[in-house]
């Protein structure tokens, strides 16, 4: 009889829930809920299980906020809960709550090559550290290391490190953003709002008034080559993505690969392919040669968070990934 576990991927807007085969990791009965439809995460979970008349003993939920103890309070949603209390209320044997990029990183060891698109470098070295990052509403970051026959995710808040300008143009952007933001983190440039920040800073640097554009407006104008400021902004976004990914690679020597997740890059994939991303990734001065063999992949799988939550829980339950 198939042993199903519950997995979830909770963002600021939507919550995705699914059943996962504890032996194979196969996902089934994926459903997306609006976060506005339920007063609590537990309410969404109960609705999912009750509508299917299914009982589970084990669950893993990936959630877009720091997980530092028993109390979880989402930064971009009103939901908040005690892990221990929800575990008891749902009658679960195992209830794992992990950061969303912990889940994405845990998907890497079980993800097929058909779900990856490579941007330069050689082949990944088995067992070597991995870096995962992705721009969306914010900038998520995690590393993954292989220790004692298990994969261990190293989550953190790497998107909030200082933005490191490395050209005259980037210096100008940093100066302008600092005037309005104070501390300028990498996320202030590598996110949906970050793309808007780059565009505005480019226009302001020429003493002009920027338009009130959304990220999708900037992307469309850049891809269609109808606005030089938008094209400059998106080009610089790609370069900064490369620089930031290169920094992650240097931190742990990620010869297992650097993996890009998040919803932004797939929206302008052809533009990204032709951009200065890879050159910026390798642009580490004396360590350029070190960088050249490190592969970078774009994750194209539709549900890496659910896949990774399943992989994390399966490993907790004793399976080898």
UniProtKB/Swiss-Prot annotation:
> What InterPro entries does its record include?
ATPase_NBD (IPR043129), Bacterial_glucokinase (IPR050201), Glucokinase (IPR003836)
Localization (cell):
Cytoplasm
Residues binding ATP: 8-13
Q: Which domain of life is it from?
A: Bacteria
Reactions catalysed: D-glucose + ATP = D-glucose 6-phosphate + ADP + H(+)
Q: Offer a single GO CC term for the protein.
A: cytosol
Tell me its EC number(s), please: 2.7.1.2
Enzyme's top EC category: transferase
The protein depicted here goes by the name Glucokinase
